[in-house]
């Protein structure tokens, strides 16, 4: 009886832990910022469309070592972010008010093949899930930016994540996270050279989370947990290069990276085969990636196109993979700038 019970618990643990660790991540998806992290949009309305692709085929333990060597599978998602900034043409507290909203659509999938759990068994277990649709909505109603002298642009803000994406505990077609989030963000760009061609950039995000409902992988029993708080840092060092002598076209190239850590423990309990297990026992996750960014800029037209690639070189208690980010932005300047003579 003891052996059978141990096998059952092991099976339940694998079936619940694999998707759990695959989902170990903050609401903030790293890779959104790199170069120009502190740059303030010109007064007017700025629209940006950002596509994010993340894929991974490796699951790590709390030491960063690959686990479940005989488990194969992939975890991937696409996010299409539609971001709108509004920047009034007047200063507040010496800076610019720059709120924005990001309405997101997502497509994701998780496929994992577990080996046979019982001696003599020829077949294993396949875990799979996937969905697409409206994802959670990111709103930053309070966001202020300042030009500090000629060398520094800085912004700081408060945002929240609304769980507008479809979520049902235990479902395999979830798109949203299933809980509210609160974020405090900052962005800094330091211009190393007087002509602002060379820059160092840093973006930070601290997020705290509300409660979410989770479901036991086997019995379907529900419980509530509070995901631990997370801190994300994104950085970049870049160089702008004129493509035309009149500076009407610019290229910007740089080294970029991100780091994300869980900084407080999870609250509440999971249910594993009906047995409460403290969510705080799940190890803290972290992930670190490095890559490059390339921008094409038309300053007079307010247009920027960009491409970023990150390879994650270290991940603990979560999946490890790679991130592609690409898209563009356009600013409708209000008032319209006077034509150059």
Model-derived regions, located:
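Residues on the lipid-exposed face of transmembrane beta-strands in outer-membrane beta-barrel proteins
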Residues: 35-37, 49, 81-88, 139-144, ...
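Transmembrane beta-strands of outer-membrane beta-barrel proteins
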Residues: 45-47, 95-103, 152-158, 182, ...
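Surface-exposed strand-loop-strand hairpins of Gram-negative outer-membrane beta-barrel proteins
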Residues: 24-26, 54-79, 118-130, 172-173
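Outer membrane beta-barrel transmembrane domains
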Residues: 27, 66-67, 212-341
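Short loop/turn motifs that connect adjacent beta-strands in outer-membrane beta-barrel proteins
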Residues: 23-24, 37-44, 56, 88-98, ...
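Sec/Tat signal peptide C-region and signal peptidase I cleavage site
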Residues: 17-22
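Transmembrane beta-strands of outer-membrane beta-barrel pores
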Residues: 51-57, 103-109, 160-166, 204-210, ...
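Residues that define the transmembrane beta-barrel architecture of outer-membrane proteins
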Residues: 74-80, 128-138, 176-182, 225-233, ...
């Amino acid at each position: 009886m003891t052996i059978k019970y141990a096998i059952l618990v092991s099976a339940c643990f694998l079936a619940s832990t694999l998707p759990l660790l695959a989902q170990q991540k903050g609401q903030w998806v790293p890779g959104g910022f790199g170069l120009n992290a502190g740059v303030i949009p010109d007064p007017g309305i700025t629209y940006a469309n950002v596509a994010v692709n993340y894929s991974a085929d490796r699951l790590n333990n709390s030491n960063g070592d690959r686990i479940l060597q005989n488990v194969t599978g992939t975890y991937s998602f696409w996010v299409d972010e539609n971001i709108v900034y509004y920047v009034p043409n007047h200063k507040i507290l010496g800076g610019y008010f720059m709120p924005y909203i990001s309405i997101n659509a997502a497509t994701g999938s998780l496929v994992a093949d577990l080996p046979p759990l019982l001696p003599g068994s020829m077949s294993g277990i396949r875990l799979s899930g996937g969905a697409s649709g409206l994802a959670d909505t990111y709103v930053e109603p309070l966001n202020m930016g300042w030009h500090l002298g000629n060398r520094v642009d800085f912004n700081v803000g408060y945002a929240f994540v609304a769980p507008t994406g479809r979520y049902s505990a235990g479902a395999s077609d979830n798109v949203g996270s299933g809980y509210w989030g609160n974020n405090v963000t900052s962005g800094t760009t330091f211009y190393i050279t007087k002509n602002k061609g060379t820059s160092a950039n840093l973006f930070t995000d601290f997020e705290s989370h509300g409660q979410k409902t989770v479901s036991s992988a086997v019995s379907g029993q529900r419980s509530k947990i509070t995901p631990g708080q997370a801190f994300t840092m994104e950085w970049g060092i870049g160089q702008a290069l004129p493509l035309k002598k009149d500076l009407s076209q610019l290229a910007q190239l740089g080294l970029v990276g991100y780091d994300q850590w869980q900084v407080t423990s999870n609250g509440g309990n999971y249910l594993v085969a009906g047995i409460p297990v403290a969510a705080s026992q799940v190890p803290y996750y972290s992930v670190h990636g490095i890559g490059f960014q390339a921008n094409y800029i038309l300053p007079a037209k307010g247009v920027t196109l960009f491409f970023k690639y990150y390879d994650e070189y270290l991940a603990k208690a979560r999946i490890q993979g790679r991130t592609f980010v690409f898209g563009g932005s356009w600013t409708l300047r209000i008032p319209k700038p006077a034509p150059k003579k």
